[in-house]
Amino acid sequence: MPARISRATYAQMFGPTVGDKVRLADTDLIIEVERDLTTYGEEVKFGGGKVIRDGMGQSQLSRAEGAMDTVITNALILDHSGIYKADIGLLDGRIALIGKAGNPDTQPGISIIIGPGTEIIAGEGKIVTAGGIDTHVHFISPQQVDEALNAGITCMVGGGTGPAHGTLATTCTPGPWHIARLIQSFDGLPMNIGVFGKGNASLPGALEEMVRAGACGLKLHEDWGCTPAAIDNCLSVADHFDVQVAIHTDTLNEGGFVEDTLNAFKGRTIHSFHTEGAGGGHAPDIIRVCQYPNVLPASTNPTRPYTVNTIAEHLDMLMVCHHLSPAIPEDIAFAESRIRKETIAAEDILHDMGAFSIISSDSQAMGRVGEMIIRCWQTADKMKKQRGSLPDDRPGNDNYRARRYIAKYTINPAIAHGMAHEIGSVEVGKRADLVLWNPAFFGVKPDMVLLGGWIATAPMGDANGSIPTPQPMHTRPMFGSFGKARTNTSITFVSQAAMDEGLREKIGVDKQLVAVVNTRGGIGKHSMILNNAMPQMEVDPETYEVRADGELLTCEPVDVVPMAQRYFLF
């Protein structure tokens, strides 16, 4: 005879189910469980007196007979594809199955086999997301990897050589020698990583050798001269090798205006960095490029969201990042031309409309690498409070908005950079780069981060404690961050040309190299999931007012944001 329990009791035991609602951190964003792939009455749970015991929820089947390496039980999955509850089976560092776990000898409808060789991660009451992907990283210091991983980032794409002045300002690694050294360093870092080569050149030879040396993309930056000739040449090389191009355009409009840059694109796919303009780009109207089908528009977290402090902090940041001097009037004018409250306010709304597709950090070069996810959800919360529910959201939940915003740092950057066959979503066949969150700490402090199916970092108490939880409790590296586990659970993204030339053996790295694919004509703005709006854009050159399809885009700065100081008292 079936037993009945209250929803509250059920959620406490097995996590929320269909119709239950969950608040994300201390925001006003509410998600609702859309479907449940587990079976009522047959839920599996680990622990004393619980289900996953020999002959009960645990079968006799070996790994060779189909048992999983790891099962995450009763997880609430938050993904661009939906918000649903399921068990997740991991095998060989990948997501093997999503569905119902247990013992097929004693339970009906089992798709995920738990055997004696299966580890269990309790997902009850936890939210599981794909690891975040940050596609705007200045590799200034290796310590960024620790900050990013502990914030839920599992892939970093960018360039640099350390605290050299070229790297402090620009997101690229110049030349094959530097690229080789950087890729060699990745063996010591628990993170999936890709490198941008420098894209600023008017002839192809130097760019081609960087792609062959392992660059998975090329970066055009105004500080190296972002001329129409350089743009055209860089895109031509990228088309030949199937790698993405990221661009930071000409703030001073010296080599041309935004129309000249658009003409140089010639309709070819390109990833536009900090499209709002405060981070750089044609002043004052680079924001217009988000209307074009070949432009994949992103913005960075220093302007996310628009607050009462945003304008004030930007000027000094910009002077440091771009090697400018406060004693030179022209340098000050350059900096001030980029900081416009009108376009920053419009940026909030364009993200909420789905016209801006990607959020990234701009790490240590105006942005904060550990705050990319926080700033994304702060923007979503601000927009809900100022603009209300989205038309596609159902009454009582913010599922559509949540899916739109999580896509900005998971699936869309993966698609943009040819990595979506490996990462970017909670999907069967992809790498098990997963983040577990306590809903109260969602987006702020992960409960656990898995890289390639193994735990890389997690909150942990005193190692001499009698249990794992005595203070001081803070995020620490786990076994997945050490030794050869580190090189066997994370990868380096490179070009197919580098793979063909045997780069791994040539430079002697242990990490697996994986080629990026489909970064050029096969993708465009239409490929940006839940973020493919292309409104007709106008920018007033005198007032900087921004309009989309004739509507003025403006919003007030806020003086309080969620996911902030209350989470960082200790």
Swiss-Prot record:
It catalyses: urea + 2 H2O + H(+) = hydrogencarbonate + 2 NH4(+). The active site is at H322 (proton donor). Pathway: Nitrogen metabolism; urea degradation; CO(2) and NH(3) from urea (urease route): step 1/1. Ni(2+) 1 binds at H136, H138, K219, D362. It is found in: Cytoplasm. Binds 2 nickel ions per subunit. The keyword Signal does not apply. PANTHER family: UREASE (PTHR43440:SF1). Disrupting the ure1 operon causes loss of urease activity, decreased resistance to low pH killing in vitro and decreased pathogen survival when inoculated in BALB/c mice by gavage. This is Urease subunit alpha 1. It comes from Brucella suis biovar 1 (strain 1330).
